[in-house]
Curated annotation (Swiss-Prot):
Catalyzes the hydrolytic deamination of adenosine and 2-deoxyadenosine. CDD domains: ADA. GO terms for biological process: adenosine catabolic process; hypoxanthine salvage; inosine biosynthetic process; nucleotide metabolic process; purine ribonucleoside monophosphate biosynthetic process. This is Adenosine deaminase. HAMAP family: A_deaminase (MF_00540). Zn(2+) binds at residues 12, 14, 197, 278.
Amino acid sequence: MIDTTLPLTDIHRHLDGNIRPQTILELGRRYNISLPAQSLETLIPHVQVIANEPDLVSFLTKLDWGVKVLASLDACRRVAFENIEDAARNGLHYVELRFSPGYMAMAHQLPVAGVVEAVIDGVREGCRTFGVQAKLIGIMSRTFGEAACQQELEAFLAHRDQITALDLAGDELGFPGSLFLSHFNRARDADWHITVHAGEAAGPESIWQAIRELGAERIGHGVKAIEDRALMDFLAEQQIGIESCLTSNIQTSTVAELAAHPLKMFLEHGIRASINTDDPGVQGVDIIHEYTVAAPAAGLSREQIRQAQINGLEMAFLSAEEKRALREKVAAK
């Protein structure tokens, strides 16, 4: 179901949601951190989704063990490097990795700006080693409040040339986008792109707010857009992309089953929607699974899957020249 003549992208992929279970085990041992299990087999149920979680917040707790072992900036650098290695193994040509440095720094009180620098270093080295093209999206974790998000924003601004876009993620219901207007004003002043997690836990009004008040060019998840026909029309007309994450939306109980996922209807409506993973390390999936298993189960035809793959590059935070070069590189292989 993957068209090998086209670039394969993953533009909604959390770096801090893709820490390998084996790495969690190794870092836990290195830094003498108590883990809930001492073997890979027994650790996996604690760090990966085995059965669907009742809601988004429950799902997010699965990520916590991964960041609890980030006891040094070297550990942050390692997981960033491994994220690129994993992308290469999956056959990705281009990946946008998003991360929350405040969340990664929290367990061991690491310097937030230092985490940003370590991630940049790890990703740069990974791209050199594995030949994958990558860009970084900075996440503000809304769950920790406005002041914590301000700290994350300052850390990103200290490395503004290495950050491509700003995102807002976490508890969408408890911390609406209206709390973060000034943060996104500064992001736009920095000439960053804007993507926002919206319409996952909250309704279509959250998507409208992300677009109108925060300046979102893309929406992460956006499943609740299906409830508002005017919004669907607007997304299609303005070419505001939806970063769909099929398996993730089932595991968080945002959508009951793949057959009920709105991605097919988004594509039929002319919305620029793409297929992505979200937190592959926690979910126990990869981009190949999303294309070959999840997308057909969600009712997508072969042509719709191909369109979603095309959309992934069209939606990417790349210049027209970068997109053209990537298409030519893949076509020449």
